[in-house]
Amino acid sequence: STEQSGFLYGADCIFPNGYGSGNSNESINTIILINKMMHSIDIKGYDIILVGFQSQIIPYSLGNIGFYPLAQHDQILATCPDGFILTVNYDDAEDYIERAINYLNSIVYGEVIAIYLFGYKIDRLSFIQHKEPVNIEKDLLSAKARSLAEKFGIPVFFDNQYSELIETIENFFQE
């Protein structure tokens, strides 16, 4: 997990690399450290190891080096996931989603096996002003999920479709 709250969810290791973490991005050292963490988890004999990444897996803008997702890139290289579940926002542009899918499908040998559509609208200004996120109506989410699934050929989940998502993950790893 990349968040301290990961321990609340049973994470075996925490590598904070989000906003204000203080972890500098020294790629080689980061990759070695995370790879050692992965090994310490692997020797416990789990069938599946879940890894969470910070948002913005690819940059929205190249106008500021602070927007480059270098830590996320290093973490992907260090963990080499077999499968990805890409979480997207309702308002994310389809070309951005497509770039993210292409990136994840090419950086390591893994592939995007599912998309999870976040059911709240949070614009940047509202986030800065600490406003509550707004629920997106289920029929709008459903239509967007169908559209994304059709466009990308990847199952799309939203709301409480956790059992279907788990089934997709299990089927992927049973192949």
Where do the PLM segments sit?
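Flexible phosphate-sensing "switch/lid" loops adjacent to ATP/NTP-binding sites
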Residues: 1-175
